[in-house]
């Protein structure tokens, strides 16, 4: 049974109802509809913390989805799961792949920056200030991209860039 039929969360049910209506009225191929169904079920599983199920749905959606823009959001969500699982290298890979398909995903840039900043903090704790600076510089680049895409957002990142002298 599709996840959308068993989900008890009000918001997920509402989203599923609206998504089903849109799938009926917007002209799409059966493959696109099936890809979206897997994507929707992946989001539902992800919101409940069922990451293994979410990944299965996202991978199936990736197999079916051909639109680069839609694929970017699937890849982004896969990156979120890997971030939540502490698999930062995999997460960075998926965020990067999402940005290759859709360079207007500031949230992917931000998440990449957060991971790089975290790795910089880890390097400091390990006594490697040179490596830390490399990670912080990379975090700065990703935050600059996120801020350029959505000026006025990511205020804390903007302040960090100013405080550390990385804002240009």
Swiss-Prot record:
InterPro entries: PSI_Ycf3_assembly (IPR022818), TPR-like_helical_dom_sf (IPR011990), TPR_rpt (IPR019734), Ycf3/AcsC/BcsC/TPR_MFPF (IPR051685). PROSITE patterns: TPR (PS50005), TPR_REGION (PS50293). It is found in: Plastid, Chloroplast thylakoid membrane. One of its GO terms (biological process) is photosynthesis. TPR repeats lie at residues 35-68, 72-105, 120-153. It is a peripheral membrane protein. The keyword Membrane applies. It comes from the Eukaryota. Belongs to the Ycf3 family. Essential for the assembly of the photosystem I (PSI) complex. May act as a chaperone-like factor to guide the assembly of the PSI subunits. PANTHER family: CELLULOSE SYNTHASE OPERON PROTEIN C, TPR REPEAT-CONTAINING PROTEIN MJ0263. HAMAP family: Ycf3. This is Photosystem I assembly protein Ycf3. It comes from Ipomoea purpurea (Common morning glory). The lineage of its organism: Eukaryota, Viridiplantae, Streptophyta, Embryophyta, Tracheophyta.
